[in-house]
Amino acid sequence: MGQVNLVRIGRNYLNAGGSFTLTTGILADHPVMLTTSPAMVNGAIHSFVKAASLELVNGIRINVVSSGLVEDAVEKYEAYFPGHNPIPMKKVINGYVKSVEGKGTGEIIRMYDNC
């Protein structure tokens, strides 16, 4: 609930035209073994972003960047994501740039290839 609470409280302090960028991962769309709870949370955040974007005022935007397994973490996490194609960190960074500097709201910015 940390990211949700950040938006719930932060919207009262964010300047008009500001934005929130939340973070999730590939598990919302492509869960793997033993990830039921994380997959559920990722999917819930996706739905929260879509709904909250309809209710935020003063031009405040909200998006979520959802990343696949990042190349930098392959050594540590590859066993948990069999058959997944690692994503270059630059691609993930560009997702955040798109969210912060773009004009979209309510977007799930998926930064992963077809697993």
Where are these regions (language model features)?
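Catalytic loop of short-chain dehydrogenase/reductase
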Residues: 1-6, 11-57, 66-69
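C-terminal helical subdomain
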Residues: 57-60, 64, 70-115
